[in-house]
């Protein structure tokens, strides 16, 4: 499986990032999770449902510093409206079959323990996604959903454009 990578410094060549197999990517993700105050509370067994599917399906992107050290990663899924409703209203985790089940883009995990958030958000907004709007869930420590965040594609969208696009969406919470 290929590895999706990004380098904050565009002058660095992506070919310098070593190709990693599934276990190498799992190790990088685990290292970053352990550095994140929010994510390090996860029990290790959550990795089976939260990390293994996106790593196998190549629905993740790693970010590296100039020395090729991993500094962040993002996972996403394409889910159904029913899966979204279940996640928002009941909490819990997706099952394997949920990860590629529909056309709603969910950024499942955004792990950036060393900063780099503005660069990553800019990269995600300028990436080629199959839809204009994605969402992510802000969770409380107990796993319940505190907020549904909506993301719009490309930096030229304005906040009122997003509000107009939302009117046609079913929004829970």
Regions found by a protein language model. Name each.
Residues 1-46, 167-172:
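Short amphipathic alpha-helix that is part of the acyltransferase structural core
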Residues 46-48, 120:
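Short alpha-helical segments and helix-capping/turn motifs at coil-helix boundaries
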Residues 50-62, 81:
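A short helix-loop-beta-strand connector motif used in the catalytic cores of GNAT acetyltransferases and
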Residues 62, 66-78:
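Conserved beta-strand in the GNAT
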Residues 75, 144-147, 165, 171-173:
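Extended, composition-driven regions rather than compact fold-specific motifs
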Residues 80-158:
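Acyl-donor binding region in acyl/amide transferases
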Residues 153-171:
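Alpha-helical oligomerization segments
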